[in-house]
């Protein structure tokens, strides 16, 4: 008995079962992917998905972006019915699209429409990286092109927020065609005197960065956004050199003249509102 009483203590502790752990409802908390601090999700939504601790800009949903920018109740969505097909009969493509539709409540990886920012009417497009990583297929190209053409016809500015991993490989050459299609629409719009503002968010890469995303009258970016065509590893293997640690970040692009300004997300509405108002005459402010 005494031997049992003074025996060596175990050097390990029991781990509580899953049932004994605190029951936290799914979606209640959100961890910052940069500093790893945990917040209530509603706090992050209120902060526009910017970490209060490290200022890291997390991806926003398309509709959260719209709510953060537009005058209350003024946004009208366009072309929601345009969706992706499967022209190459790519295996499992349709099921993946269906899964993303259910997850995001979006019909495609871009939302387009018009509304007012600081009482200025604009045509608008916002890409959502939660849907197929914002990859550009024929449906996204068509929706963006239509939005640009509507801006030209109505003589209003066009503003786009990009977030994309590039062209959608499941659609092959049809996805690559969207680079030329959207870029030509931008050229026609700008030739007619239209104002285009592009805001590149994390990430803006591949065919999107090499087409409409980087040819606005103003090209802005959010802090820390990854902006580039090919990936770092591919470039390093090709040129056989080590790239700078900040290569392809928004700040790197600003330093090298590829973007005009890096704008904090919480300053975006005010900055765009002032810029749009500066460019518009009194007739368009009614």
UniProtKB/Swiss-Prot annotation:
Function statement: Component of the acetyl coenzyme A carboxylase (ACC) complex. Biotin carboxylase (BC) catalyzes the carboxylation of biotin on its carrier protein (BCCP) and then the CO(2) group is transferred by the transcarboxylase to acetyl-CoA to form malonyl-CoA.
Residue ranges constituting the CoA carboxyltransferase N-terminal domain according to the UniProt record: 28-286
Cofactor section: Zn(2+)
Keyword Zinc applies: yes
Keywords (A to Z) from UniProt: ATP-binding, Cytoplasm, Fatty acid biosynthesis, Fatty acid metabolism, Lipid biosynthesis, Lipid metabolism, Metal-binding, Nucleotide-binding, Transferase, Zinc, Zinc-finger
Assembly with partners or alone: Acetyl-CoA carboxylase is a heterohexamer composed of biotin carboxyl carrier protein (AccB), biotin carboxylase (AccC) and two subunits each of ACCase subunit alpha (AccA) and ACCase subunit beta (AccD).
InterPro entries: AcCoA_carboxyl_beta, Acetyl_CoA_COase_Trfase_b_su, ClpP/crotonase-like_dom_sf, COA_CT_N
An example Gene Ontology molecular-function term: ATP binding
Main location class: cytoplasm
Entry protein name: Acetyl-coenzyme A carboxylase carboxyl transferase subunit beta
UniProt-annotated binding residues for Zn(2+): 32, 35, 51, 54
Cofactor, free-text remark: Binds 1 zinc ion per subunit.
Pathway in which the depicted protein is active: Lipid metabolism; malonyl-CoA biosynthesis; malonyl-CoA from acetyl-CoA: step 1/1
Class of the enzyme per the UniProt entry, highest EC level: transferase
Family label: Belongs to the AccD/PCCB family.
Zinc finger (C4-type) in chain: 32-54
GO cellular component: acetyl-CoA carboxylase complex
Pfam families: Carboxyl_trans
Subcellular location: Cytoplasm
EC number in record: 2.1.3.15
Protein source organism: Oceanobacillus iheyensis (strain DSM 14371 / CIP 107618 / JCM 11309 / KCTC 3954 / HTE831)
Catalytic activity: N(6)-carboxybiotinyl-L-lysyl-[protein] + acetyl-CoA = N(6)-biotinyl-L-lysyl-[protein] + malonyl-CoA
GO annotation terms (biological process): fatty acid biosynthetic process; malonyl-CoA biosynthetic process
């Amino acid at each position: 008995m005494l031997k049992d009483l003074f025996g060596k203590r175990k050097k390990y502790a029991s781990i509580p079962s899953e049932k004994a752990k605190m029951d936290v409802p799914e979606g209640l908390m959100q961890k910052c992917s940069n500093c790893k601090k945990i917040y209530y999700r509603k706090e992050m939504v209120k902060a526009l998905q910017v970490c209060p601790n490290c200022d890291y800009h997390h991806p926003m949903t398309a509709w959260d972006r719209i709510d953060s920018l537009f005058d209350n109740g003024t946004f009208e969505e366009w072309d929601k019915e345009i969706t992706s097909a499967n022209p190459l009969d790519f295996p499992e493509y349709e099921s993946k699209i269906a899964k993303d539709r259910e997850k995001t409540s979006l019909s495609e990886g871009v939302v387009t429409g018009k509304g007012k920012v600081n009482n200025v009417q604009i045509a608008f497009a916002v890409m959502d990286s939660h849907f197929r990583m914002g990859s550009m297929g024929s449906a996204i190209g068509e929706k963006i092109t239509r939005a640009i053409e509507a801006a030209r016809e109505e003589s209003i500015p066009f503003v786009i927020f990009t977030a994309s991993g590039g062209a959608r490989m499941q659609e092959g050459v049809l996805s690559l065609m969207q680079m030329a299609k959207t870029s030509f629409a931008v050229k026609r719009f700008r030739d007619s005197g239209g104002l285009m503002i592009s805001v590149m968010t994390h990430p803006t890469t591949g065919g999107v960065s090499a087409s409409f995303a980087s040819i606005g009258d103003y090209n802005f970016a959010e802090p820390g956004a990854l902006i580039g065509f090919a990936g770092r590893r591919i470039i390093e293997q090709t040129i056989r050199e080590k790239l700078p640690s900040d290569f392809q970040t928004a700040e790197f692009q600003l330093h090298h003249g590829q973007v005009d300004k890096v704008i904090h997300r919480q300053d975006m509405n005010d900055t765009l509102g002032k810029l749009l108002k500066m460019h518009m005459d009194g007739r368009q402010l009614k």
